[in-house]
Amino acid sequence: MAMQGIESQDWAWFTFSRVRVLRELADGRSERDAAERLGIAYSSVRSVVEELKNKTGLHSVREIGHWWRGQAGEWLAWCAEQAGAAQKGYGTGGD
C-alpha cells in the first residue's frame, strides 16, 4: 500500500464534502452505502473516490478508509489552525 505524503498546504484540498465521503469510507462503508447515508448521488461518491485515489496514490476504498483513520486528526488540527482556534483554545471552556 504505497501512500503519498500530504503536505500541510495540501490539506486545503480536502473540502468538507470530500471529508464527509472519507468519514464514511473510514467507517467501513461501501461507496453505495456512503452515497445513501450522505444523501448524494452514487456517481458523486465515485468521483470523490477517484480524486482521492489520485491524490493519495492508494488503489482501493478500503485503503483510503484506513488511511483517513490515521490522517483525520491531522486534518482537523490544520483546520483549527486555519481558523485561529488552535492557539486560542477555543472549545476548551477556557476562553
Would you name each region that the model predicts?
Residues 1-10:
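Short, Lys/Arg-enriched N-terminal segment that forms or immediately precedes the first helix
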Residues 12-18:
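Short helix-coil-helix linker/hinge
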Residues 13, 26-27, 56:
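Helix-turn-helix/winged-helix DNA-binding modules
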Residues 18-25, 64:
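Short alpha-helical "packing" element that flanks the helix-turn-helix/winged-helix DNA-binding module
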Residues 30-63:
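Recognition helix of helix-turn-helix DNA-binding domains
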Residues 54-95:
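Basic, Lys/Arg-enriched C-terminal extension of HTH/homeodomain DNA-binding domains
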